[in-house]
Amino acid sequence: ILAVASNKYQSATVKLISHYFPNIRFTAVFGQREGVNVKPDPTVVHDILDITRISREDVLYVGDSGVDMQTAANAGVTACGVTWGFRPRTELEEFHPAHIVDNAADIAVIAAL
């Protein structure tokens, strides 16, 4: 199961995901929504967990920023930082995620564990 949790506005998030990942079926695509606190508040992750009925222990939260690592920690899920995003590796390391990867193939390996 794949889902998106973004701090971009909801309409922009949906548009970007549809454009860049047209062949991937996401269970949920959430951006900023009225009345919902933005990350690192864990509400968006909790909303996804409610929809998917997946336990926190089975989640790998993949992100490219310290805010993402904080969100994962706040939600009680496993964090995986990716080094090809907008923030430097050092920012990810500050939050001590369970994993930091340098390429997408490594995510599949971690998810299979």
Language model segments and positions:
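Conserved phosphate-coupling serine/threonine residues in phosphotransfer and NTP-handling enzymes
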Residues: 6-8
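Asp-based, Mg2+/Mn2+-dependent phosphohydrolase catalytic module
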Residues: 10, 14-113
